């Protein structure tokens, strides 16, 4: 089990296709009662270890696409790993199960070494994971504009903010840090890489992690694992300016009612070219509807506490559904601007905000 978990931690960077460069696969070294595992694909490098009975120190580089799946299928209990001197093969044995894999020259593997970064911050793993989950969905998946595929991490004194956008919607979450970081600044990390990081985090209530960064790299240290990633170069949009300072309407809705209304209209929206949904705020109600002559029409209305002018406005239905999937509590608050962005605010979590730009309706 320890061997499987260690291989799983570094798998993301292992480049297990045999046709790639020399650094592909798993670098494994054994000494002083532990086995260290590394993988490096030049965009990320991961290093972890597990305890072991080491009879003789040594290291191997295994370019084995099926190594992890093979180890997973071995019976529970001790696994013996052995490479005989002068041979380019490594053997794994568990009970009556035996496998061997070819090895490559370890001298050409780019080792993952800890970088002495200037800036450091410590925080709870669960807080970091929550922040990533609450904003990453808003990032773009279009590699043509790499800035928007990333998440901005903005650290200013004891306030840590994450923001993600695809230029049509933006999600931002901030927390107050228990420890003051060694410096302030911001950096951009791929949203998919941060998802990889949080999949590896320990889940204990008080488990801590360290984040350290410099001009080109960010490192995440937690438990037995060190995760190093390249940063995305470029200037991120000023997320604070995206949120309007004034609105024409404030609407407080029952979250469950709003979810059901959007869900009811969404089948029509999903079949339309621009996947739009219309909202009409008036007379203490919110009407949600969409129609297309070739598809049909769906509409419903729910009670709403309204403060401001009547507004009719259109949004991308998927973008509205996305924030509702990440919302909690009994109520949700919409701050609406005629022909302008709508800010979605959580009644029970003011530090989590979402803004979405309108679309042209019928």
Each model region followed by its residue ranges:
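Structural preference for solvent-exposed beta-strand-turn elements
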Residues: 1-362
């Amino acid at each position: 089990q320890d061997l499987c978990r260690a291989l799983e931690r570094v798998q993301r960077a292992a480049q297990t296709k045999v046709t790639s460069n020399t650094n592909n696969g798993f670098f494994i070294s054994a000494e002083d009662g532990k086995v260290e595992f590394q993988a490096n694909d030049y965009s990320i490098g991961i290093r972890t270890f597990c305890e072991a009975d080491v009879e003789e120190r040594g290291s191997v580089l295994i370019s084995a696409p099926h190594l992890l799946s093979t180890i997973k299928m071995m019976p529970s209990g001790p696994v013996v790993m052995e490479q005989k001197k002068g041979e380019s093969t490594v053997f794994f044995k568990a009970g009556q199960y035996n496998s061997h894999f070819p090895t490559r020259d370890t001298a050409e593997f780019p080792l993952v070494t800890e970088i002495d970064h200037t800036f450091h911050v410590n925080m709870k793993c669960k807080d970091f994971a929550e922040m990533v989950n609450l904003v990453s969905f808003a990032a773009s998946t279009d590699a043509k504009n790499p800035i928007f595929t990333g998440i901005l991490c903005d650290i200013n004194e004891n306030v840590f903010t994450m923001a993600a956008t695809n230029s049509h919607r933006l999600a931002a979450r901030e927390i107050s840090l228990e420890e003051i970081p060694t410096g302030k600044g911001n950096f951009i990390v791929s949203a998919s890489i941060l998802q990889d990081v949080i999949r590896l985090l320990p889940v204990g209530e008080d488990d801590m992690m360290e984040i350290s960064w410099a001009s080109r790299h960010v490192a995440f240290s937690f438990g037995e694992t060190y995760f190093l990633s390249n940063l995305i170069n470029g200037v991120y949009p000023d997320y604070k300016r995206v949120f309007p300072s004034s609105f024409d309407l404030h609407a407080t809705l029952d979250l469950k009612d709003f979810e059901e209304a959007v869900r009811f209209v969404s089948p029509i929206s999903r079949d339309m070219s621009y996947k739009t949904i219309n909202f009409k705020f008036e007379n203490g109600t919110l009407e949600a509807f969409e129609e297309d002559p070739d598809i049909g029409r769906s509409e419903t209305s729910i009670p709403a506490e309204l403060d401001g002018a009547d507004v009719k406005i259109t949004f991308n239905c998927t973008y509205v559904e996305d924030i509702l999937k990440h919302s909690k509590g009994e109520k949700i608050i919409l701050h609406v601007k005629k022909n302008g962005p709508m800010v979605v605010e959580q009644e029970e979590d003011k530090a989590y905000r979402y803004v979405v730009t309108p679309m042209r309706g019928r």
